[in-house]
Amino acid sequence: MKNKIAFVAVGQAGGNIGQLFEQKGYNVLYINTSQEDLDTLEKAKFKYHIPNGEGCNKDRRKAKQLVIDDFDQIAAEIETKIKSELIFVIFASGGGTGSGAGPMLADLLIDDGKTIGAMTIIPNPEESVKSHMNSYECFSELTQIPGLASCFILDNNNGDKLELNSRFVEDFCSFLDIPEKHKSVKGNIDKAEIIETLKAHGMAVVTRQKAQESAEVIKAIHNTPVSYTHLTLP
């Protein structure tokens, strides 16, 4: 799967999750308007600083315009560094750089002919009013992007954000590893089916259940409340 799926991590929060995927062996391009934030990613292989950006300080409009102005170069970076069948854009919905640049970048890349999914983070209730306004606007834009593949949502209200990031990446990678690690004479899930699932438009849910048969797994998932997992997806 590592040659089929890659990630564009936008902003500081996106970078935190991107690093976990890179540690798993996936290609990740880190994009930020803040050079200082990029400098904290010491072991990152691919980093790109958007010109004229010195951070966006929760200003979504500024982040969107910076992406529009520099899209040709951003697209070239993606094409040369992490060309893959499916690319997920990772960003926080409540910040500035990620919240503004994430949906805009996803939309422009889809228009450019690429298959794009999203992974985004919603703020916890204690964060600022501005963060929640940004998150609302971010999701309003995400829902209007035609052709967007699956979208995963991490809810920071479900626990420590760094722990949630780690659990999410572990669960997501376990899902990607199903064709390699789980084989049965009763039937298998192959890589193409995993990719097709992730390409499907709409929100996605990742949860953990143990069972011996497929019917038991399906029943367990149906009985799992959405609030159970740190991932809540439409």
Kindly label every feature range from the protein language model.
Residues 1-234:
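Tubulin/FtsZ superfamily GTPase core signature
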